[in-house]
Curated annotation (Swiss-Prot):
Site (Important for recycling of cargo proteins with the sequence motif K-D-E-L from the Golgi to the endoplasmic reticulum): 193
InterPro entries given in the database record: ER_ret_rcpt
Molecular-function GO term, any one: ER retention sequence binding
Location of the region described as Interaction with the K-D-E-L motif on target proteins in the Swiss-Prot/TrEMBL record: 47-48, 159-169
Main function: Receptor for the C-terminal sequence motif K-D-E-L that is present on endoplasmic reticulum resident proteins and that mediates their recycling from the Golgi back to the endoplasmic reticulum.
Entry GO CC: cis-Golgi network; COPI-coated vesicle membrane; endoplasmic reticulum; endoplasmic reticulum membrane; endoplasmic reticulum-Golgi intermediate compartment membrane; Golgi membrane
Keywords on record: Cytoplasmic vesicle, Endoplasmic reticulum, ER-Golgi transport, Golgi apparatus, Membrane, Protein transport, Receptor, Transmembrane, Transmembrane helix, Transport
Family indicated by similarity: Belongs to the ERD2 family.
Species the sequence originates in: Xenopus laevis (African clawed frog)
Membrane topology according to the record: Multi-pass membrane protein
Record lineage: Eukaryota, Metazoa, Chordata, Craniata, Vertebrata
Important for recycling of cargo proteins with the sequence motif K-D-E-L from the Golgi to the endoplasmic reticulum: annotated span: 204-207
Protein name per its UniProtKB record: ER lumen protein-retaining receptor 1-A
Cytoplasmic side: 25-32, 80-92, 136-149, 200-212
Length: 212
């Protein structure tokens, strides 16, 4: 495992725990898109269907368990534990416009036409756009809390570091996964505007807002 993947995993874990801690400490999920979190739960479920059949390392298995468990814990807190604080009026992105096309694309463009491979490919495609409901929600409300901004920034850094991970693997291992690279590029591009606003506003103590 190279340094970029490790740092990417650390950034991803940081994003997850920032979000969980924010919800639990404030006893509120205001400003958090339940739809994005539900999409992430679908992503990790589809990606790690091999959890009990394909053992690579303790680290790999542990990360899979953490991602799946934390995604469902987040969904549970939003839609059950702190449901009264969930802002469903602004969380209105039509997620079927993300799920259906990525599912179809996974059937058409994949590495191997087997159930596990199709589900894995679907998870890669869906993850690349899963943050859209959250960004859409921020644009509708006009601003995001600082802690929510930190969460989004950590997610964006995770995807950017994973792009460097793919470059590293191609350079030193000769490994090239076009599906993962293209999906990672799409996801990173979605964060570009947010990155700029994060640096120019949030780091200067101002609230972040996205154009409606």
């Amino acid at each position: 495992m190279n340094i970029f993947r490790f740092l990417g995993d650390i950034s991803h874990l940081s994003a997850i725990f920032i979000l969980l801690l924010k919800i639990w400490k404030s006893r509120s999920c205001a400003g958090i898109s339940g739809k994005s979190q539900l999409l992430f739960a679908i992503v990790f479920t589809a990606r790690y269907l091999d959890l009990f059949t394909n053992y690579i390392s303790f680290y790999n298995t542990s990360m899979k368990v953490v991602y799946v468990a934390s995604s469902y814990a987040t969904v549970w807190m939003i839609y059950s534990k702190f449901k009264a604080t969930y802002d469903g009026n602004h969380d209105t992105f039509r997620v079927e416009f993300l799920i259906v096309p990525t599912a179809i694309l996974a059937f058409l463009v994949n590495h191997d036409f087997t159930p596990l491979e199709i589900f894995w490919t679907f998870s890669i495609y869906l993850e690349s756009v899963a943050i859209l409901p959250q960004l859409f929600m921020v644009s509708k409300t006009g601003e995001a809390e600082t802690i929510t901004s930190h969460y989004l920034f950590a997610l964006g850094i995770y995807r950017t570091l994973y792009l460097f991970n793919w470059i590293w693997r191609y350079q030193f291992e000769g490994f090239f996964d076009l599906i993962a690279i293209v999906a990672g590029l799409v996801q990173t591009v979605l964060y570009c505007d947010f990155f700029y606003l994060y640096v120019t506003k949030v780091l200067k103590g101002k609230k972040l807002s996205l154009p409606a």
